[in-house]
């Protein structure tokens, strides 16, 4: 299918930020008496929004979770992301090759954080106002399909005509539930060999290790 528009996840698809999130999450949970490695944080929590992450932590640890866990994570996140994050390799070139298609971002992160990092990378102009946050624009963030349905409606394009680029099983589940076509991208520094299999298990038919490979698959000049 030749898509009518492309929707990008942000963390791990545009910004190489997931490894930083996993590091701070593992460190903060371990300091709170909930031993969590970076690898476990990547596997358990990548792709979730803030509320969903806290729910997953509660499901994992139960009554051992400190009552101020949300505040601890918020404070550590502010520190860890005080500096901008780098771009995923190849995203600028891919955006330059898809200017004929409408694009949007559908993320679990805040629009302020997304815009600040788009400005830092120098690609904000590719998305205009089409930046959508699961914590700001819809009631339920990923893995629910709401944010992708919202982005599709804002673009005026049926979900079945969209191509979504995702790096996490959680995000892929959301996009597929919305009725979109989904490809996996494993170009981030957080991506491990098992990620391709995890994306496939969610129903993602094609997974690409680079934006160059994805561009070739789409037949982009």
Give the location of each predicted region.
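Residue-level detector of anion-binding/catalytic polar loops
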Residues: 35, 102-104, 181, 205
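Hydrophobic packing residues within well-ordered alpha-helices of enzyme cores
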Residues: 25, 54, 91, 98, ...
